[in-house]
């Protein structure tokens, strides 16, 4: 496994005017970009970038800068397969020659990052390619564009970077990949990080939720407090059903019974027997009610293990044709499980939870909640009922996704509801 450096080192290097290398996901470009802060651009840095990269130098900017400078899309309908938001190319209007030299491009980069610059300070077209980053950075789009802007902002600089893809020194005509990038980083004293690490760092160190409303909700299991949250960057709403006092004068936030439940319209609302989600939700509410203290956190945006409702219905079509729940996702070009629990962890922290007994049979959920200042002291099995419609689904979760589901092999379709088995979507 390739050795990586810390995000903290990368941020410090960016602040100091050094370049870093950022690798994206293997399922995306699987390439490493040389990145530095645009306001720190020098002729030497640009020359180094040109020497070891493709030479197609881009300057990622946040949306506010693009709007201020009148940087319009390069083409009305973006057809780039990764959605990179190219704008019209530019040169600095004054202080440069032809615009192509390292010195000229460094001047243009610094001007793009200058908060006092205006649209008329640039000529169009030019030799530098500004890119528009998504609001929310890598949390919205895991690309090098957003990584550059995030790193600059985290370093206390203007949200403007300079990026270009590093080319292979071993395989002429190809881009450099992970192992070669590590060697290159060591040779030149550069930090090497991944976009995944940057996403994880931001999720752990920044708050991305807002508590919006709280209301009393009487249910057949008793009364809960429904506390509504919005996710700042994802335009998704979540709700926590809270019973009893979690933290406060008479509670310390420890030993809280918690269920983090993934949204499932078909199971939770329509009572679909293809999954075990509805019975799990009902059982979790009942168990928290009996406990007298706990949280059932209902996570929106997790439909179909994160692939969305329409894709889930398409996956059902494939399952009806013989695929299992995992293979169906993969046949659609989607991950077997695309859920992220970072927002859920932040909500639990906001509610005052410090340590919990987690209601789940999915070990991955436990891993997904670790590392956010939360301590999971126990995994509590959540019983549900298997039936003829969901038994194959449950077995696939057990066999391919590692869910802890005991007793499924004893199921017989001739028996209507054979007993209770744990399952966690």
UniProtKB/Swiss-Prot annotation:
GO terms for molecular function: 3,4-dihydroxy-2-butanone-4-phosphate synthase activity; GTP binding; GTP cyclohydrolase II activity; magnesium ion binding; manganese ion binding; zinc ion binding. GTP binds at residues 259-263, 280, 303-305, 325, 360, 365. Its EC number is 4.1.99.12, 3.5.4.25. The keyword Nucleotidyltransferase does not apply. The record marks 127, 165 as: Essential for DHBP synthase activity. Keywords: GTP-binding, Hydrolase, Lyase, Magnesium, Manganese, Metal-binding, Multifunctional enzyme, Nucleotide-binding, Riboflavin biosynthesis, Zinc. Residues 1-204 are annotated as: DHBP synthase. It comes from the Bacteria. In the N-terminal section; belongs to the DHBP synthase family. This is Riboflavin biosynthesis protein RibBA. The gene is ribBA.
